[in-house]
Amino acid sequence: HFQSPPFTSAEALQKIFDLTIKLSEVVGKIKLHVVNFTKLQTEIVKRVPSNYTMTSTRRFMLRIAEEVAKREGCLALATGESLGQVASQTLESMNCINNVTNMPILRPLLTMDKVDIIKIAKDIETLEISNLPFEDCCTIFTPKAPKTKPRLEKIVAYESRDDYSELIDETLASIETYLFDKNGRIITQDIKENKEKKEEKEDFSDLL
């Protein structure tokens, strides 16, 4: 999950926790990675022409997601895009977004009708939570006229004007991870901290 505090609220994050709890009851244990996206996202808005900021934002999200996936040993990424539903979900847009990763991208909802997607959400009891009116980091920075058919060469040119590597590293370092069991309980909070403490302990023991 990508959040951009203070532009996104604590209620918006709680909504994600509530959705994760519901999903864990359906699919079992879930690991939730919360990415603090504020600094990188605000720089995208400053540096990229407004009608291309949505495309660029999605591209950077995918870059971050790919790094997390590699750390976790995942072989693919999965998104909830449905073709034609919003500006960022056209074939042209997906082509531009896909370009930043070599990982397979699974889109199980791609050709599903909105009515069918809503039915699934009702069945697994996530629809009501999803409809809560808390803005996410995509909606708060939505441009007035997002490009529905972006051109790859243009977005590559816009992003190549600046070096984002330091911002990407900072964003990756900001990630907090939570593990939910099949009953929706948090069984490990901020795994990154626990892992670092364990590594510190191991390093110290080597000195004994």
Per-region residue spans from a language model:
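ATP-dependent adenylation/nucleotidyltransferase module used to activate substrates
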Residues: 1-123
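Peripheral terminal appendages
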Residues: 30, 74, 90, 94-103, ...
